[in-house]
Curated annotation (Swiss-Prot):
The active site is at C59 (nucleophile), C62 (nucleophile), C195 (nucleophile), C198 (nucleophile). The lineage of its organism: Eukaryota, Viridiplantae, Streptophyta, Embryophyta, Tracheophyta. Residues 1-18 form the signal peptide. This is Protein disulfide isomerase-like 2-3. Disulfide bonds join C59-C62, C195-C198. Residues 143-166 are annotated as: Disordered. Its EC number is 5.3.4.1. One of its GO terms (cellular component) is endoplasmic reticulum.
């Protein structure tokens, strides 16, 4: 009996050791447990907000988080999904999402790349963060920015197939103009039509391009048709994904997971890393108007007082204020420009500025031919709120009466203005009768 008992005890011990302390979460836990088999259907195709904890059973911090995570799951039941994934058991899936430490909490929202939860590991902040994501999702749906089922089942069989891709087709004729001479961040897939891995990537690439539209440009090159580009960028296998950042002459390969969420997360990280410092440009002519305002979603135009009224010190304070605002919105497709009072008379007339009331600001949408004036004080908080409101669609937008005429003007030299002194004259001289005297009778 004793050998049998000993053997049984060994089996039990082995079972306990093998059973993942895994089970940080039991079958009856309110925390759902995901794996590679159900991750896509439960997370990527979900219609709602999903919070996923990537954990390792042996991780002390993960064990401390377990009761907190379960309580948060209970509070959020029916509002948001709270789940966990054993990253130790499913290393490949964890690597796709760049998991390097435990626990890592990622929040998945339909139609957007996942974001890391960086807050305190306590029930209240976790729940509050989840609710903020839910509210943002609902707000987007109300505003028509995403459909109610954007992350779930396809609503129509053909619409998905016929929808044009947001990835731009690149070739030897347009590559330099669109990519290498551009200031934008580009991520380009070099593919071959017959390549199986490329076909597998295609729907993920299309999804990433759609979600990143307006932020990061994605393009694709058919290497069967574009051998010169393939050779120039030393493409030897398919698909090859190259990142064209600030240094367009030295693109580097993307080596992350070939899924939309990973591509999107990487692209947004690169966008932040490559973001140019914010600028507030002077509106000195038609070219400046075209460059700064024509392509921007919204162009915020400030009309500053004449240099004789504010002097250089005052004007610089206004420009510093505008730079602070631009910094807050540097990830948004906005531009900020300024002009001095009276320099762009037709523009002032069209937007109801001029004669008095400097400084002033308007939100200008050149494509729609509309504008909205700042009706509050020219101060940081008020301007910041004005920019946010304009980004949400604005209130009280007014139509432009045609295209404003922008005239060429000299840029400000950074100095105080010079008062032009007129020649002094004597009132007696002005009133004197200088007509010749006639002595004749």
């Amino acid at each position: 009996m004793r050998p049998a008992v000993a053997a049984a005890l060994l089996l039990v011990a082995a079972a306990v050791a093998a059973s993942p302390v895994s089970a940080l979460y039991s079958a009856g836990s309110p925390v759902l447990q995901f794996n590679p088999n159900n991750f896509k259907s439960k997370v990527l195709n979900s219609n709602g907000v999903v919070l996923v904890e990537f954990f390792a059973p042996w991780c002390g911090h993960c064990q401390q988080l377990t009761p907190i995570w379960e309580k948060a799951a209970g509070v959020l039941k029916g509002v948001a999904t709270v789940a966990a994934l054993d990253a130790d058991a499913h290393k490949e899936l964890a690597q796709e999402y760049g998991i390097r430490g435990f626990p890592t909490i990622k929040v998945f929202v339909p139609g957007k790349p996942p974001v890391d939860y960086q807050g305190a590991r306590d029930v209240k902040p976790i729940v509050e963060f989840a609710l903020s994501q839910v509210k943002a999702l609902l707000r987007d749906r109300l505003n028509g920015k995403t459909s109610a089922g954007s992350g779930g089942k396809k609503s129509g069989g053909s619409s998905e197939k016929t929808e044009p891709s947001a990835s731009i087709e690149l070739n030897s004729q347009n590559f330099d103009k669109l990519v290498t001479k551009s200031k934008d961040l580009w991520i380009v897939e070099f593919f071959a039509p017959w390549c199986g891995h490329c076909k597998k990537l295609a729907p993920e690439w299309k999804k990433a391009a759609k979600n990143l539209k307006g932020q990061v440009k994605l393009g694709h090159v058919d290497c069967d048709a574009e051998k010169s580009l393939m050779s120039k960028y030393k493409v030897e296998g398919f698909p090859t994904i190259l990142v064209f950042g600030a240094d367009k002459e030295s693109p580097f390969p993307y080596q992350g997971a070939r899924v939309a969420s990973a591509i999107e997360s990487f692209a947004l990280e690169q966008l932040e890393a490559n973001a140019a410092p914010p600028e507030v440009s002077e509106l000195t002519g038609p070219d400046a108007m075209e460059e700064k305002c024509a392509s921007a979603a919204i162009c915020f135009v400030s009309f500053l007082p004449d240099i004789l009224d504010s002097k250089a010190e005052g004007r610089n304070k206004y420009l510093e204020l505008l730079l602070s605002v631009a910094e807050k919105f540097k990830k948004s497709p906005y531009s900020f420009v300024w002009t001095a009072a009276g320099k762009q008379a037709d523009l002032e007339k069209q937007v109801g500025v001029g004669g008095y009331g400097y400084p002033a600001m308007v939100a200008l949408n050149v494509k729609k031919g509309a504008y909205a004036p700042l009706r509050s004080a020219f101060q940081l908080d008020e301007i910041t709120e004005f920019v946010k409101e304009a980004g949400r669609g604005g209130k009280g937008n007014l139509p432009l009466d045609g295209t404003p005429t922008i005239v060429q003007s000299e840029p400000w030299d950074g100095k105080d203005g010079e008062v032009i002194e007129e020649d002094e004259f004597s009132l007696e001289e002005l009133m004197a009768d200088n007509s010749p005297v006639n002595d004749e009778l």
